[in-house]
């Protein structure tokens, strides 16, 4: 022990103190951007195997963005989900069939701490999903200089079926997926507001988080800004990254689900059903759907792919 603390803890405190006092590339090269908060929304983050809330390349890229932002000195704030069961592990049964096995992550053993409001209170944030509220609590993960905030619906305020909403990455049917993505996008914005964080730039890592743009539109319209001007401002301050041209990698929902869970929003925006659905309408061979990537592309001022060729194809 050193001053009552384990040696490892003392080393980490000394390391953090040393790193925090060093100038970063951003503070030296573009000091005007050093303290500009960037909100980075992603359905998964691959930070470390002690926090298994990722399934593949989308999460690994998100984790690398957090780490690189820390190294550069960019004030990046990640927003995602705390999945206690994470993504499934593959196992073969005795007869050679693939089985999906989920392992439970004990929050007390993970590198998490409760996220606190500016008043020092544990954050419990209500999120409107249709005619109901789903409540989320928030966990904080330090990724060097960057921060990651993970939403968790497993709280007493929720019904049992809502408590399971954030249990697994990419689990459930389309009903579960649209509810989860409403919480990620709309709930994520409200979480940042509750924590006193005001981003200047909003980055959507794939279309899963595209409902961020709908919540921000609502904020502007409620503040008295005309919808056309609100759309322009959201586009000016929002960017997105798309990861695959493969249709299975893009979420699209039937109109009736969008109506069921988001109908209060077109009333708050002062528009009708058709105008709202037009934000994300895409025609498939079987008919029209509400496409999350189309929503992201229409509501952002810049979009990129994960490579030059992929960006051109997408």
Identify what each model region corresponds to.
Residues 1-314:
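Catalytic cores of carbohydrate-active enzymes across secretory and cytosolic contexts
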């Amino acid at each position: 022990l050193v001053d009552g603390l384990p040696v490892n803890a003392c080393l980490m405190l000394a390391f953090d103190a040393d790193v925090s006092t060093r100038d970063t590339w951003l503070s030296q090269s573009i000091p005007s951007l050093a303290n500009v908060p960037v909100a980075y929304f992603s359905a998964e983050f691959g930070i470390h195997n002690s926090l298994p809330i990722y399934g593949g390349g989308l999460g690994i890229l998100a984790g690398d963005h957090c780490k690189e932002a820390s190294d550069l000195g960019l004030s990046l704030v990640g927003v995602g989900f705390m999945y206690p069961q994470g993504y499934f592990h593959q196992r073969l049964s005795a007869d050679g069939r693939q089985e999906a096995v989920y392992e439970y992550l004990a929050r007390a053993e993970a590198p998490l701490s409760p996220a606190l409001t500016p008043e020092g209170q544990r954050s419990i944030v209500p999120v409107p999903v249709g005619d109901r509220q789903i409540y989320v609590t928030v966990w904080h993960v330090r990724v060097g200089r960057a921060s990651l905030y993970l939403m968790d619906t497993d709280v007493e305020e929720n019904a049992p079926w809502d408590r399971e909403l954030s249990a697994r990455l990419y689990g459930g049917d389309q009903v579960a997926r649209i509810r989860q993505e409403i919480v990620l996008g709309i709930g994520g914005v409200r979480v940042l507001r509750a924590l006193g964080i005001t981003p200047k730039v909003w980055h959507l890592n794939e279309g899963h988080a595209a409902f961020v743009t709908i919540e921000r539109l609502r904020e502007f319209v409620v503040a008295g800004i005309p919808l056309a001007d609100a759309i322009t401002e959201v586009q000016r301050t929002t960017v997105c990254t798309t990861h695959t041209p493969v249709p299975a990698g893009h979420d699209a929902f039937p109109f009736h689900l969008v109506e069921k869970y988001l109908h209060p929003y077109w009333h708050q925006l002062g528009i009708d059903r058709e105008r709202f659905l037009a934000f994300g309408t895409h025609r498939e061979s079987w008919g029209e759907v509400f496409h999350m990537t189309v929503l992201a592309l229409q509501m952002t001022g810049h979009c990129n792919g994960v490579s030059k060729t992929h960006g051109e194809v997408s």
